[in-house]
Amino acid sequence: MAKAKYYGTGRRKSSIARVYLVPGTGKVTINKRDMDAYFGLETLKLIARQPLVLTETADKFDVLVNVHGGGFTGQAGAIRHGISRALLQADADYRPALKKAGFLTRDPRMKERKKYGLKAARRAPQFSKR
């Protein structure tokens, strides 16, 4: 019989992460690269691992991630969201803890669009009195 495979989609800013949890030793692979090779900053690794640490499943699942779009911070947030959703498929008892920590909520904050007449979303051209 095939091993159990749990799936979750995570989104943050313009990043989308497809996350698969497979029973294993706790290895995290992002876009066919090790997490340490993919994320340079330690804080990004911590953000991505938060749901596994919270539910104490860091050494019970191997995490396979395919992520695209956005920057590293958005991708780390998308991975966290995806892992949280996949953990719910694995065991629904994790829901209260994940919900309380805010890992199941899709962060709706997006980049504000640039407006005409302005240099950026809100940045106006320099004002000259004379």
UniProtKB/Swiss-Prot annotation:
Xref: Pfam families: Ribosomal_S9
Family: Belongs to the universal ribosomal protein uS9 family.
Keyword Ribosomal protein recorded: yes
GO molecular function, one term: structural constituent of ribosome
Database matches in InterPro entries: Ribosomal_Su5_D2-typ_SF, Ribosomal_uS9, Ribosomal_uS9_bac/plastid, Ribosomal_uS9_CS, Ribsml_uS5_D2-typ_fold_subgr
Swiss-Prot/TrEMBL keywords: Ribonucleoprotein, Ribosomal protein
UniProt feature, compositional bias: Basic residues: 111-130
Official protein name in the record: Small ribosomal subunit protein uS9
HAMAP family: Ribosomal_uS9_B
Spans annotated as Disordered: 109-130
Gene3D superfamilies noted in UniProt: 3.30.230.10
GO biological process, one term: translation
Residues passing through the membrane, by range: none
UniProt GO cellular component terms: cytosolic small ribosomal subunit
